[in-house]
Amino acid sequence: MSLKNWDNKTWLSSNSYIKSFNNFLLKQIKLNKNSQILDIGCGRGKILGSLSSKLSLKRKPIGLDIVKHKDRDKRIIFKKIDALKFLKKNKKRFDLILVKQTIHLFKIKDIKTILKLSRTLLNPNGKIIIFTLDPINNEIPTISIMKKKAEKSFNKRQENY
C-alpha cells in the first residue's frame, strides 16, 4: 500500500494529508460509528480526531503517546503512556489498532510483543494497520535541515585547521 507523505514542509500533518490519510485508511478497513479505535504513537491526535469526526464515533478513540503535547486533539482520549504498558493492562477490545510512523522506534522484541498483545485485543474482523515511511521516497523534512547544519559545522571546523 502506498500513501503520499505529509505536506513535506513541516513535521505536522497538513489538513490535506489528514483527509487523504483517512480516505486511504477507510479503503483498507470498514469502520462505522460503533468502531473502537486505538492509535499507538498518536502524536497530537489530529488524524485520529479527524477520523472520529468523519465517522461520528459514539466513543472517543484512544490515542497513546509518550509525549503529552499541549495542543492535542480534544476529540480523542489521550493517554501519555508507553504502548507496552498500556497493552499489557488494557482490557478493551478494538476494531482497529493503528501504528503510524512509529514502529521503527521500538526494539525488535518489543515490536513482537506489541503485535502479539494487539492481536489479542482485536474484535472479530478487527485489524492492526501499520504505516511506516518509505525511506527512499520520503525524507523527513528535518533531515535536510540537520544535514545543512552538520555541513556548516564541518566547514567551520575545516577552516580552523
Identify the meaning behind each predicted range.
Residues 98:
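A conserved beta-strand element that flanks and buttresses the S-adenosyl-L-methionine
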Residues 101-102:
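Short catalytic micro-motifs in class I SAM-dependent methyltransferases
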Residues 35-43:
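Conserved class I S-adenosyl-L-methionine
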Residues 34, 94-95:
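Local beta-strand N-terminus motif with an aromatic residue
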Residues 1-29, 44-76, 80-88, 129-161:
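Class I (Rossmann-like) S-adenosyl-L-methionine-dependent methyltransferase catalytic domain
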